[in-house]
Amino acid sequence: MIGKFSRMALACLAAGAMFTGMSAQAKDVKLTTTDTMIPTGDAGIQLFVRNKHPAGQTKFAPEKILLYVHGATYPSETAFDLPIAGKSMMDLIAARGYDVYLVDVRGYGRSTRPPEMSQPPGDNKPIVQTRVAAKDFGTAVDYILKKRGVSKINVMGWSWGTSTVGLYTSENNAKVNRLVLYAPQWIRTEPPPAQWPKLGAYRLVSKDSARDRWLKDVPENKKADLIPPGVFEAWAKATWETDPDSVTR
């Protein structure tokens, strides 16, 4: 589901900078990658889960297991596992000995798109609100707990994903070792609008509008150097390829 919070990808670049210090250690660590579709309690809805960990390692303590979830616009895969200079944020964390997972909630990335997404957005109410996202996130948590034989894990949300993991943790505290809130969307420097626009089932975002949002509020003399050459194009290509209808909309 391509929506409006287009700054997530820019935050991905910032996160990559945060983990630059891990690069040397990550360089020679071989990782195992597994992609899985897991069922939910709703008929026909499956969730995409990716796992990366050091090759040959199958036992992990709860404090070494991490599940990440995306924000309101783009899927986890291209926010958390897009290689920049050869490594993604997910790669760098896994290379430090972590068992790292990402999940796309329904309607995003490779996860099942609800049938309402085949209809015009104005025909239905929002279909993936925070309560639904938290439910899907919990499905992924339970999958990992069972797979690794542990009782709790670390969880991380990005942007709107902080609301998802925050809600989940408030109701399932015993299953969470540590809660990481990265770039919470409720931290604002301007007052909210007096009236929010009416939302449909989903929202559409173009590549041009995504780039514009990345560069919003950036001083003109800084814009040319903000995004490394080719990074936006690589991210946009990978992101829009996750939407099977992006070419025809």
Where are these regions (language model features)?
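Short, surface-exposed "cap/lid" segments of acyl-processing enzymes
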Residues: 56-102
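Glycine-rich "HGGG/HGxG" loop immediately N-terminal to the catalytic nucleophile
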Residues: 76-79, 103-125
